[in-house]
């Protein structure tokens, strides 16, 4: 699997296949996703169901597993890691400084629910080649502090206790990013905003 995750040894995971389209998951799940089981050391996997026409789990498997291990060691109720190519977040990585504090503040200002949904903020990983160990390590370091990490020019990783919370976190961050993108396209400077004293 490209990494070692002993805290996840022997566990099962449902993951998408590499190169598979998410829209096909509901149409042909047996060809688009798979259930994997990790060995007793957390170093290898075997496919126990799915990918019936061949294939491999997502190329981001090391990142998914390392992130989940970090979160589960903090709180055993964490069980979902979700990765998506969030369009507006990606756009912002081309114009905002790639700093946790800057992204957090800008996203918090766009919608009042943001400080409630992600009170610890968001982390930002600078551009790295996806699918490798380096980006997995960088992301898992951020997951020690945040539930959401942004990959510059690529997408977002979110972690949570169930699918609804995890998808909701990512959706809230992406919605806030969409508001910011629209605001920046109309006027680069805010005329009024939510200040830290207001929240």
Task: Label the predicted regions.
Residues 1-199:
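Glycine-rich flexible loops
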């Amino acid at each position: 699997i490209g990494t070692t995750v002993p805290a996840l040894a022997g566990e099962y995971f449902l993951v998408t296949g590499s190169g598979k389209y998410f829209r096909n998951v509901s149409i042909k799940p047996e060809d688009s996703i798979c259930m994997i089981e990790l060995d007793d050391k957390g170093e290898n996997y075997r496919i126990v169901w799915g990918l019936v026409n061949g294939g491999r789990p997502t190329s981001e498997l090391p990142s998914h597993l390392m992130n989940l291990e970090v979160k589960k060691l903090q709180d055993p109720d964490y069980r979902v890691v979700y990765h998506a190519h969030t369009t507006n977040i990606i756009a912002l990585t081309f114009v905002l400084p790639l700093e946790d504090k800057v992204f957090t503040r800008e996203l918090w200002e766009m919608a009042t629910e943001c400080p409630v949904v992600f009170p610890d903020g968001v982390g930002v990983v600078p551009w790295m080649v996806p699918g490798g160990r380096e980006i997995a390590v960088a992301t898992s370091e951020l997951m020690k502090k945040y539930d959401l990490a942004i990959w510059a020019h690529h997408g977002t990783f979110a972690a949570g206790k169930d699918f609804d919370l995890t998808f909701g976190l990512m959706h809230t961050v992406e919605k806030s990013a969409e508001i910011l993108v629209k605001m920046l396209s109309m006027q680069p400077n805010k005329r009024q905003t939510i200040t830290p004293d207001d929240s």
